[in-house]
Amino acid sequence: MTLANVFIQDTIVAIATYLAPSSVAIIRLSGNEAIRLAKSICVKKNHWHSHRIIHTYVQDDQNQLIDEVLVLPMLAPRSYTRQDVVEIHAHGGVVVAQTILQLLINRGARLAKPGEFTLRAFINGRLTLTQAESVLELIHAPSVAMAKKALSNLRGALSTQLHQVRSELIQLLAQIEAHLDFDLDNTFVFNSFINSLTNIINQIQNLLNTPSKFYRYGIQVALLGPANAGKSTLFNALIGEERSIVTPIAGTTTDVVEATLQWQQICFRFFDTAGLKEASSEIETKAMAKAQQIAKQCDLILWIIDATSPNLPIPPYLLNSKPLLVVYNKIDVDSSDVLDHVLDHTSYPTVKVSALYATNLSQLKQLIWQQATQLFQLDGIYINERQSQLLQQAKQHLCNLQSALDEGYPLEIISWHLKNAIQCLDENDVNASTLNAIFSQFCIGK
């Protein structure tokens, strides 16, 4: 049985909390029989009111008490799924939660599939598909900023914009269809139509320009530089723990070390890489190839140089490829006039630090933050990959429409392109495989 074909009138049940010893375990039901099934295992069976907590006990088939619980009934349509929903709040623990779950299954409830509660919320019109995806994105948010974006979309920020764009396209389609049906002289004034179309394309492009990957995956920062420049020491200083191995021997780091942390609500992913030098073994060759690969995929490069040898050039493949900060390390060893001369002739943002003694580390962090805020703005709307693909498809149909207008194609072709763009933005026109792909990512109980 696929999620898209679930018969939503039956009653489902699942443990909604992490199954482990804890303070509280929540067992959730949804469906027409949710209230009856919950009452069937509870001692107190009267005076159940929607959205009011009930203190009672759960008992088994032999009337043996299982646990003291709080029960919260939520009658349709004022619930997450717009069905009758009941949450049983028991003491945390594997045995108690599973016992209550099994009692409810024995009485006729079906064990929910991953994401089935949210799927029912979507099918019953409680959430749009974009909002349903936002629930998942909120659960898996890697940073405070991403959580805020997910919550904003859950409250309808993206759905509202998509609805607005789609409504404007429908208005354009209505103009075309009305002309085809009723205009006998077969003339159509395109100036206003073209202006509206251009405005809609710009709206879609603005959504596509949102750098959403930074919210979802964080800012990727690569530490690159020659061997023995102190990259690993600086890496450890930035993340606040001893993650990379540090020795006086050049070339100690032979593999990429990654660490993730949050600064000012943004997720940063730091990569410590092997020092760049003339390879003396196959391992070193592979390590430096990996470092160059990280350089290509990251968003910001820290080019780290030993302050005692400040004249080492930046490799050509790093020049003008992406934002780059030059970090002169080991100023505790040497901060000579030669370094000052080099700094005067460097076009990239620079900072002098001592990773060993954390000198100017706050200044380096501030520079990293400044570069990050130039990559994206915190007030943008988040769109995921599926939504981005649909927006790109809609835009392509509209661009094809523009070409058709320029080439004098009949209005029937214009109408066809408009209908295709409108369909791309229809949140209710989703096939079963897409629904399965989305909701199967949820945990059971959500």
UniProtKB/Swiss-Prot annotation:
It comes from the Eukaryota. Residues 218-373 form the TrmE-type G domain. It is found in: Plastid, Chloroplast. GO terms for molecular function: GTP binding; GTPase activity; metal ion binding. InterPro entries: G_TrmE, GTP-bd, GTP-bd_TrmE_N, GTPase_MnmE, MnmE_dom2, MnmE_helical, P-loop_NTPase, Small_GTP-bd. K(+) binds at N228, T247, I249, T252. Signal peptide: none annotated. GO terms for cellular component: chloroplast; cytosol. This is Probable tRNA modification GTPase MnmE. It comes from Cyanidioschyzon merolae (strain NIES-3377 / 10D) (Unicellular red alga).
